[in-house]
């Protein structure tokens, strides 16, 4: 399901694959690089390596459980500014802190990214996500030191996309 190739210049590339085999893919690329570089063989550790955010115990009833171990860091954000505990819309379970977190730590750069991918709000309730977009844009603009023009552009772009999700 994946291939490791070496170009004439020695560039190692991996093609194909899927999320469920990323550990094997990593092993194959590292082993190929070690051989190409004349390095000693070393046993692969990816099988036992936890991915970022791993949490050994998950309470699926806890708000934000899907952030794993990062959920504690989001709670710390809230402890520094209680207003970040507020939800972004009454019909959505997401907090201001989750938006701020995504900008500061996940390279979230657009309102669409925040509402479609970081929170899935667009998929869960398109109408509510459209209504939440101005607040989300404002939070993001503050975090990124951007002004009203950016907010306006983001809202136009997001509304254009989000209206395709309305019934």
Indicate where each model-derived feature is located:
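Helix-rich C-terminal "cap"/substrate-channel and partner-interaction subdomain
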Residues: 1-167
């Amino acid at each position: 399901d994946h291939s490791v190739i070496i170009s004439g210049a020695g560039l190692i590339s991996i093609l194909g694959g899927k999320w469920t085999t990323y550990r094997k893919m990593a092993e194959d690329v590292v082993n190929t690089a070690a051989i190409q570089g004349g390095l000693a063989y070393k046993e692969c550790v990816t099988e036992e390596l936890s991915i970022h955010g791993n949490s050994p115990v998950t309470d699926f009833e806890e708000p934000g459980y899907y952030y794993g171990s990062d959920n504690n860091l989001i709670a710390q954000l809230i402890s520094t500014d209680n207003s970040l505990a507020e939800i972004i819309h009454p019909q959505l379970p997401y907090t201001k802190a989750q938006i701020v977190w995504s900008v500061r730590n996940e390279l979230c750069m657009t309102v669409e990214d925040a509402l479609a991918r970081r929170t899935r709000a667009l998929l869960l309730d398109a109408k509510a996500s459209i209504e939440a977009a101005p607040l989300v844009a404002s939070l993001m603009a503050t975090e990124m030191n951007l002004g009203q023009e950016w907010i306006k552009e983001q809202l136009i772009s997001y509304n254009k996309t989000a209206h395709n999700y309305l019934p």
